[in-house]
Amino acid sequence: MIYNSYMNLISKKYTSVVVILFLMVLTRGSHLLTSVSLPDASFALFLIGGMLLKKPKWFISLFAFSVVIDLVTLSMNITYQIPINLGYLGLLVSYGIMWFFGSRIANTKSVLKFVAFSVLATLIAFLISTQTYNLLSGTFPEITIKQSIQTGWEYLPQSFIYTMSYIMAYWGIQSLFRRQFVSQKATAL
């Protein structure tokens, strides 16, 4: 009985990892698998990863995989402009914030708490990623902090809407699965 529960948990973890990795490849960079340009889901996937996987080893693995995707994309398409430099480290911090917030809301059943933490995490992660890119990447050598913030705000609505759309889709899907599982369990009793 305990062995079966343990194996079921392990199976769920690996299934979660495979799905997250697939979605990251599907939505990141120049979209290596499709010609359809899907919005980047990385922020949402790191929040979901924090909820489902929790352990730092999974965060490190997922971040390393995101770097590999970017490097492969750069090698296949030189017009794809993502600098792998000091500004790129902002993604490590941003993704870490999403992971941390995800781990904090992993067991919540409150949609209000889920949305509030997701919004807060997304805003903080966006602010850090855009500011580190603008100020540290070398792409804008003369940019001031004020100009960097103004430039970042131009991209906030689009990034926020995409990230929250993915996160809310996850909430809806997992809620349906949870309800289905609970109703099957109740029927069996």
Go through each PLM region and give its residues.
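Membrane-interface helix-boundary motifs at transmembrane edges
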Residues: Y6-S11, G49-K57, T79-Q81, R104-V115, ...
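Alpha-helical membrane segments and adjacent membrane-interface helices in multi-pass membrane proteins
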Residues: S37-W99
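Membrane-embedded alpha-helical hairpins and interfacial helices in multi-pass inner-membrane proteins
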Residues: K109-L189
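Short helix-perturbing small/polar motifs within transmembrane alpha-helices
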Residues: T79-F126
